[in-house]
């Protein structure tokens, strides 16, 4: 009986202590990434680690959870050689690696596709828009990829990132 009570007490203590383990992805704050060369910005949660900038400084990638979570915000100069917005949207819709369960059809200058990436079974979310920046027309892309277990976290994070993913006034951030 004494052993039984000891096991029950240890089990209850372990359960109480497990409840006190803080989730490292709770209580985050938002940081701001500003690309002054391409004139755009995005807010990102502090649990993401900023990667190295590309050689062309066309954007930034972020990771978490040992790389299981991947986020990027990029901008490239728009050329017809790479295709129109309509062809880019069609390419995303026809991407055989994407199982799309949400799409925001192409409007005059932006679209969204989201779903499951078949090759790694992760959730993806992609927003693409055209920017008529002072230094030329650019295609801006926000791309997120994360395990399904992160859905609750990203349901909170994505709206903030979307709202903040925008052009900047060059004087404002230089």
Predicted region positions:
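Extracytoplasmic/secreted proteins, especially bacterial periplasmic and envelope-associated proteins
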Residues: 43, 84, 88, 156-160, ...
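Conserved polar/disulfide-associated segments of primarily extracytoplasmic proteins
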Residues: 51-153
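N-terminal "mature-domain start" segment
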Residues: 21-56
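Boundary at the C-terminal end of the N-terminal hydrophobic targeting segment
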Residues: 16-18
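Surface-exposed amphipathic alpha-helical segments
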Residues: 48, 138-174
């Amino acid at each position: 009986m004494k052993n039984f009570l000891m096991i029950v007490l240890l089990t209850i203590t372990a359960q109480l202590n497990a409840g006190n383990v803080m989730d490292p992805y709770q209580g985050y704050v938002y940081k701001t990434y500003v690309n002054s060369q391409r004139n755009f910005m995005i807010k990102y949660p502090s649990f993401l680690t900023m990667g190295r900038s590309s050689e062309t400084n066309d954007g930034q990638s972020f990771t978490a959870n040992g790389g299981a979570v991947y986020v990027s915000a990029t901008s490239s100069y728009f050329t017809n050689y790479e295709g129109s917005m309509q062809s880019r949207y069609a390419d995303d819709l026809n991407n055989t690696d994407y199982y799309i369960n949400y799409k925001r059809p192409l409007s005059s200058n932006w679209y969204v596709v989201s779903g499951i990436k078949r090759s790694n079974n992760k959730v993806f979310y992609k927003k693409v828009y055209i920017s008529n920046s002072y230094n030329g027309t650019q295609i801006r892309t926000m791309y997120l990829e994360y395990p399904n277990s992160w859905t609750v976290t990203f349901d909170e994070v994505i709206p903030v990132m979307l709202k903040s993913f925008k052009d900047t006034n060059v004087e404002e951030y230089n």
